[in-house]
């Protein structure tokens, strides 16, 4: 049985708003039918967020498609933010790496940003994977239906904000904005938001967000976990510290697995409201203790050519760092450098955050203090940087499990990273 469309939706499909709009609607209908959706529902958030922010030369079909939309006047019904820019002159790169970036990889960046502006880009600073930060301003309300695609933003919006969004693909995201509807299935439905895993946290200390997220993602894959025992370490209020933790935790669940929604007992909105009623019948159980986290960490392959190479670069901020993280890390780096008797970090280190967050950070005394330590701040996407084959060959370290998963970067915990960048690359 096919999808049941309203008269308005059927009219768009039949060409009432032109051939291009009909194609967009047909694409969404086919997408929905592939997942057995019975109907389309309105997109209700104020803004959208697009995953495709990078002007790779090989993405010509994307530019052709976007141009067709622009020419037909099929612009987004919502303004939107987009994932981070791939390039920043502040980030260290040698002449050859720069040549590859500008001439061979992201040689359509300016052209593509021009297309995004015509389609409905919020503003020139709206490039970040953490669009939900209050400084950026694209923060959906609980229950709103979204057409987002960036996996770390989708899982945050679903879990921490209680919005409703599937893990859409790039381009499919803007199509939902253009017609104003998305297929109703999966994480948009009450049933699809029920947990099929109970994850019990039995660690002796607060688990590393990126490591815990990785463990859960690899175990449950695309299922919904209900996490018990984490409120012992995070509390029961979604304050800045808890939201920052869940940002990094969620990104790891979404990239090391394919999690689009998690519930944290006594903390996230739906878990607070419904409790264990969110757990589906027959849910499986996964217990995480210190030994399990260590097992997961030890399982990561080291893909450097030379395992013992001295790191040449450190990236922090995948997803982009919060204002709270930038401040906390300024204190931590300063203190560790003082203990080591140094004034500057001994590995080139880049902290990445949203342009709007960096603007706020620059207004605080912390910005000058961080600059003194030699740490560089940037709005770049570290993943886009690492996709340059010449950069991928370098020994790069990170505390991001997402960056580890998608690139050659090597994962260390926050504490281990701090030792490496302040004490000369020594292991923690």
Provide a role label for each language-model segment:
Residues 1-315, 319-428:
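Non-transmembrane, aqueous-exposed alpha-helical and coiled segments at domain scale
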